[in-house]
Amino acid sequence: MASITFGNACTVVFGQVRKEEVTAGPVAVNLNEGTRMVVVPTAAQMATPTPSVSIKIINRWSNKAVSSYERQVEDVFANFFAKKERSDELLTRYYGKVVQKGNKLMVKRAPLHVARVLEKQRLQDIEDEKAFLQYRDAGVHVAGSVKFTDTRSRGQTVSFRTEHYKPTGKIVQKKKAQKQRANADVDHLIDEVMKICSADCKQVEFISMGKRRLTAKFKLFGKSVIPCIHLAHEQGRRLRRELDPRIHEQVIAHLVTGRKVRELIKDDMVTYGWSGAILNKNLFKRTPFRWDEVVIRGRLYGKLVDARSKLSECSKDKIHQYSSFEAQFWKGWKNKFDTLHPHNKDHICEPTINNEKCGEIVATIFQAIHPVIKVSCSTCRERLTKASNEELNEYLATNLACHKATFDDMRQQHATVNTVLNKIEQTSLANPNLKDSMEIVRLLQNLNQTQARQLMKVNNTLLKGNVATSEEFSDATTQLLEVTRWYAKHLSLVDEGSISSFRNKATSKSLINPSLLCDNQLDRNGNFVWGERGRHSKRFFENFFEEVVPGGGYKKYQIRNSPNCTRKLAIGNLIVPMSLERARNALIGESVERLPVTEACVSRVNGAFMHVASCVTSDNGSAHFSPLYSPTKRHLVVGTTGDSKYIDLPATESDKMYVAKEGYCYINIFLAMLVNVNEDSAKDFTKMIRDTIVPMLGTWPSMMDVATACYILTVFHPETKSAELPRILVDHTNKTMHVIDSFGSISTGYHILKAGTVSQLIHFASNELVSEMKHYVVGGEAPHARRMRMEKALIQGIFKPKQLVYLIEEDPYILMMSLVSPTLLINLFNVGGLEVAMKHWIKKEMNIGLIFSMLSSLAQKVSRADLVNEQITMIDANAAQFIETLAGIDVENPMRNELVSALTMMLARSDVDSTLNKTGFTGFSDTLLEMREKNYWRRAQQGMVRAKLVGKIFFNHFLEASAKAYYGTFAKHKATRYRRQVCNLMYLVTWKDQGPIQWSKKCNIRSV
């Protein structure tokens, strides 16, 4: 069945056409079944819409506007390209070549005359082609043939392809080209590499066996390309032979293959910069050489020298080497100039002066601030180095004056040079008013007051003038400020005896003790000889001192107790570490609370200050705090504010170390007085102290009593008045005075008593002396001692029921100290101490009972945690709540204050650790807390062991008593069965197999 489609754009008819020729008339087509024909209407047959008048007007106006705009654009472009320089530039670019430069492609412009010739040829070709297409008769007729086209319609092959047909492109199989490998030996390969390096003047490096390297570079000398070896003298080393001919001969032969000599090279042409150049020896016929190729090193006595030739020591220093000093100079210049340039890049640098002017500016500024004849001359540089500030300023000023004309010329040409030179001239300015400065020195020369020294420093700075540094000007300003403050305060200090005006500086010189200077009392080493005094001093050491047994780091003797506090000795520092870092750590003390100068620091007599019985101050009136005092072995240390004197203790058979017993620290004062006692009176002196003075003073007496005892002793032994005292520190916080012995003091920050002799100390015995310090006791102090005692009492109370009940009733804050350790808290909860304390205090004090309730709840939570860090974190999280509950409860109780201090430290540690963790840092507090917890656990285990030991002892007593009662009442034939029962009972109680019972003679049973 045939079909016809209307509207398709195809005009081809499908079907069968008669074989006969067809005329121009209609063509008959036989349509068979299945044949399809498409009929397309012509333009005349299609409907054409007629536009309205308004649309025509709009179209006409828009077309006119578009045409006008296009003409304007064309005119702009025409005017732009009509310029001759623009057309010439485009013409050279159009006929340029695309070349490769490095890794980039760029257009190389053609010369203008070449471009014009090519353009003229192109226009001529266009004109010829146009003439050919238009058939312009040139008047030449050539006979030929005419080709006619048959216009008759004929049948043709019809394709089924539509207008959307797109042929599939042919896939071309790419054949992989096989890599061609060059077959050549190593020498040929090296020669080819040399030719490549020679073409681009590149650097090449030869590496032989080991670390031997030879660096060479092809350099351009005129039109010739010559290889140059990098020699040792280019790095500043002078060698007798720079190249070994046996090693580098083959390398030189390879380098020669890349050499290109394009012009004649004469002997006089070889100069600086030719160092390492490889030249043929035939170029230098006047100078004989050993090798065919010459490696230029320099000239010696006018003759060229080969780098392979070996020179003598004298010739090595005299040869003129031809290194390229200009390249080295500019290399160093470029390196430091680019490194030291300013960082404020607020503009784009553009060159405005030539290189010659740049060199003049640099040379002018350099000679203005660093005047030398040659920069490389060490003598010129050392002259500037060794010159003082005054000499250097004078030298700079002289140089500027000598070359004033040159410098003035540069000032006028360049404003920057003028600015820099003005700054340099300002440095030579000095203070001309020397007369007034010398008058100030004359007035203040013999004055030692603080203000006089401060004014002297200000005058010295003004006298130096430009020589003074910025630090000296800053210090002078500070000193002037201090003088101004003193003057302002001095106007208001009209009241006599004001604390603000109190000054009690330390003695700058040591006291003189005649007993220590007498030659008859010194041995050949200059040490004090005790004589009979040493034999009688045993009354002190046997009754009031105890022997120091080495071991355990002397921890047993570090803490000294007193009624108000404890004192920590530095005896542990006798163990000297051999590590520098640990040795430096031993010089760090533990500072106590540093108090300012108050009324408690001074002593008065009739309203006036008694300076020897007061605390030492600094120049500005602030308190002078004690430093760390290092320990010594077997010494008596005397001297307070001045330099200390070390006196060997009396010699004994074993040379043991002694430390004063608790409460008898003041014996060190009497031992120091014994140094000044006559040998025939030493026995009476020591017996009087042992039998009369010490029983009268007892332990921890007041300073007033000690001073009175010293007065009594000086009555019987007047020579002891000049005896020097040991160091005495004042602790105003605990109302205590510390007599420091040879074992020093780790605690720092105390006030220092100025009294240096016994006669000065006796002032404290006077009733006319008004001073708080004379009522202070003699003792010492160590930080955290109260906390250690509380922890010790808590651990003992956990395993001692009676002591636990006492703590609950009398001092509940010790039980609250269990917050410092999860181990102590859990053990206290397990023995029922928290529950008993809560029931006891809930009736007496609600807040304390609430704290014990909180402790019980916290102990249950802590016991559920598996890790120590989790337990400590739980306790730290509740520290703030405990502090809030303790607020306002028994504020004056020292135990309560110690507990609050511990909780505050826990809270602060928790806050710091959380802040560090949030910022991404890791602290080491977890490890330290674990180690501390292990110590608490170990101390708790020791208490548990003691409790078990006591239980075993009581159990043994029970077995002994029961056996004795049994054998006294029952028959002895049951002894075997009783032994067996005892063994079973002991196994159940102690969980250990005790073995067969060994009967004792007394009670017929052995002790467990």
From Swiss-Prot:
Active site (record annotation): H233 (for p1 proteinase activity), E242 (for p1 proteinase activity), S275 (for p1 proteinase activity), C665 (for helper component proteinase activity), H738 (for helper component proteinase activity)
Keyword check for Protease: yes
Domain Peptidase C6 positions: 657-779
Sequence motif Involved in virions binding and aphid transmission, location on chain: 631-633
Peptidase S30 domain location: 180-322
Gene Ontology annotations of biological process type: proteolysis; symbiont-mediated suppression of host innate immune response; transport of virus in host, cell to cell; viral translational frameshifting
Alphabetized GO MF terms: cysteine-type endopeptidase activity; serine-type peptidase activity
Descriptive protein name: P3N-PIPO polyprotein
Organism: Peanut mottle virus (strain M)
